[in-house]
Regions:
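Basic- and hydrophobic-enriched, low-structure N-terminal and domain-boundary segments
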Residues: 1-148, 152-155, 479, 490-491, ...
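P-loop NTPase motor domains
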Residues: 19-21, 25, 136-429, 444, ...
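A residue-identity detector for tryptophan
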Residues: 54, 97, 239, 255, ...
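A broad, low-specificity signal for short, low-complexity segments enriched in glycine/proline
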Residues: 99-106, 119-132, 152-153, 318-324, ...
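A short glycine-/small-residue-rich loop at the edge of a beta-strand within enzyme catalytic domains
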Residues: 105-106, 372, 408, 464
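Conserved long hydrophobic alpha-helices within structured protein cores
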Residues: 111, 115-117, 372-380, 473
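Conserved ATP-driven motor cores of ASCE-family P-loop NTPases powering translocation/secretion/packaging/pilus
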Residues: 421-523
Length: 585
């Protein structure tokens, strides 16, 4: 306790020096030779003492005054220290629903600089408010069963704010047509990775974002992590480790040695198809072996050579099995449309934080065959944006990037996501994780699921009936103290009645109450604030609703038309062949 606080705490007791001082003065001035005489004439003593309003500075009087004040202070201290601690009205819990006053410090006065959570609650986009105690990260956990309105009540209102760049998972492929026209009106660059209909997708080339050898290893890790077969062990065996070496060697070779046009997954697949190992002839060299032999002669310390040399330590039979595993893992790339999709890059992932951009990732919600491509993209996106913020913008992107990850469980596993979500806040990046139940997160991220949830300052529950989710939400809401009134009646030879009152603790909402919650209601929880039971956001009341296809079918966005228009625009970085025409002939 600092000196200033201690002084202020004891200051009131200095006032008691005066009455004790006057009491001592009255006793001293009272006529009488002994104690009984002075007590009998104490009235005369008070008359004499109070004739002057000033404190008596006679040493005995002053000492008694100070001693009296000290004794009184000690008595109050001891009484408070030994007093029983009562929490009247909150004996079993103090949980309650939040009010408008509770959320007010966390909302921006400008409606469009907020994230709409419910009809009455919003959270500001400002990462550094005037009062630091009101700072919250913008990571949001949204939980809602099928049909609870995750897209309508959360995704669409978020996009209509148009205050950030957005990367939005679109499981049904309906969000882009319904919101795209509005975003184009707001001068957004619109990107689309369509893994349902490849012909309606922009090109995505993972190799276009490799800047160093560590990026090669990150890409290989993400590729292997998201192309595991059903029931495959989470721990790697020696074959998977050998595959890792092989992919690293091939991608390293492509990145260092191939032309710009060849730096893509098609070249990687061609190299794998040209690879061969023979059980009966370990001296046999495939075309790929010859490529690496030539590279080793020229640069023996080359990154790709080192990786390939380790891979070739295996025997011929083992190498053949590894190559078969590589072919099986990359089997989806045998589809020509997917190969064409990854021929070159149009997504420009590293520029999302430079200017307002909306990237829609369209995934199938019934078939996860190509979802690994989205997981690759997200893994690269996080690393690219963090590096861009650190290397070019002093740690903070000029445009906030919001990732609205609808059906997050279908995306696949994003490498080190539990670590990324804890660090992206300072770079002006945030993630909204949208799930049908909290158990989905634990299925994919295992023990790291709790870390991910813990780094989301906001939780929005739209309804559901999955048991573990209901239990978690009920516990987070806490308990309130209620009054219990019991009435009893005993019948015998005489009838007697009894009344009793007691207090009990009750969950703010029990699991069964959560399960039958009104479909128009939702629960919003913000770290450090009481939870809110509110109406879901009414999309039709958003100021920009009239620009959506929901309001007017004429606003449907045509991505194919948009892509044709964008590809027709000449960019400063485009290259062309120049031919001279002889006009004299």
């Amino acid at each position: 306790m600092n000196m200033k606080k201690m002084f202020l705490l004891n200051l009131p007791y200095l006032l008691f020096v005066y009455p004790f001082d006057k009491l001592a003065q009255a006793f001293r001035l009272a006529p009488g030779a002994d104690l009984s005489g002075k007590l009998l004439s104490i009235g005369d003593g008070f008359t004499a003492a109070l004739s002057s309003p000033w404190l008596s500075f006679q040493p005995t009087d002053l000492l008694i005054g100070i001693a009296g004040a000290v004794v009184l202070r000690m008595a109050v201290y001891l009484k408070g220290k030994n007093a029983k601690k009562y929490r009247h009205g909150i004996e079993y819990g103090s949980a309650r629903w939040g009010t408008a006053a509770d959320i007010a410090p966390y909302m921006d006065k400008d409606f469009f600089q907020n994230i709409p959570m419910t009809q009455t609650e919003r959270i500001t986009m400002a990462s550094r408010p005037k009062q630091p105690k009101y700072a919250r990260n913008k990571n949001i956990l949204v939980i809602g069963g099928s049909g609870s309105g995750k897209t309508r009540f959360f995704c669409k209102p978020s996009l209509l704010q148009a205050h950030s760049s957005y990367v939005c998972t679109d499981p049904k492929g309906t969000l882009l047509p319904e919101i795209g026209t509005f975003l184009e009106r707001k001068k957004y660059r619109i990107k689309c990775l369509n893994l349902i209909n490849f012909r309606k997708s922009m090109k995505y080339n993972p190799l276009a974002y490799i800047r160093s050898e560590k990026d090669i290893l990150k890409l290989v890790n993400a590729l292997i992590m998201n192309t595991k077969g059903e029931g495959e062990k989470s721990s790697e065996d020696s074959w998977v480790k050998a595959e890792r070496l092989y992919y690293s060697a091939l991608i390293g070779y492509i990145w260092y040695e191939a032309t710009e046009e060849e730096k893509n997954f098609i070249t990687l697949l061609d190299l794998i198809n040209a690879s061969e190992a023979r059980e009966d002839d370990e001296t046999y060299q495939s075309p790929v072996d010859l490529l690496f032999s030539q590279l080793e002669e020229r640069e023996p310390d080359h990154f790709a050579v080192k990786q390939y040399r380790k891979f070739k330590m295996a025997a011929g039979k083992t190498l053949k099995s590894i190559l078969i595993s590589c072919g099986a893992r990359l089997a989806p790339f045998d589809i020509k449309e997917l190969r064409d999709l990854m021929e070159y890059d149009e997504l420009e992932l590293d520029t999302l934080g430079d200017q307002k951009t909306a990237l829609f990732v369209i995934l199938s919600d019934t078939d996860s065959t190509f979802n690994f491509v989205a997981a690759l993209m997200y893994s690269q996106l996080f690393n690219l944006l963090c590096d861009k913020a650190d290397d070019f913008y002093g740690g903070r992107l000029p445009v906030h990037v919001r990732l609205i990850l609808d059906e997050f469980a279908n995306i696949g596993q994003i490498e080190n996501f539990d670590k990324l979500i804890a660090t992206i806040r300072s770079r002006e990046i945030s993630a909204s994780i949208i799930l049908q139940s909290q158990s989905q997160l634990k299925t994919i991220y295992k023990d790291a699921a709790d870390t991910i949830v813990g780094n989301c300052d906001s939780t929005l529950f739209l309804g559901g009936k999955e048991k573990s989710t209901l239990k978690e939400i009920s516990e987070l809401l806490g308990k309130e103290t209620i009054d219990l009134y019991n009435q009893s009646e005993n019948r015998g030879s005489q009838v007697s009645h009894g009344l009793s009152y007691q207090k009990l603790g009750k969950e703010l909402m029990t699991q069964d109450e959560l399960a039958v919650m009104d479909g128009g209601k939702c629960i919003f929880m913000l770290r450090g604030v009481r939870p809110f039971l509110s109406d879901k956001y009414d999309l039709t009341r958003h100021p920009n609703y009239r620009y959506t296809a929901d309001a007017d079918p004429k606003n449907v966005f045509d991505m194919e038309r948009y892509m044709k228009k964008q590809r027709a625009v000449v960019k400063p970085t485009d290259t062309f062949d120049v031919y001279e025409i002889d006009a004299t002939t």
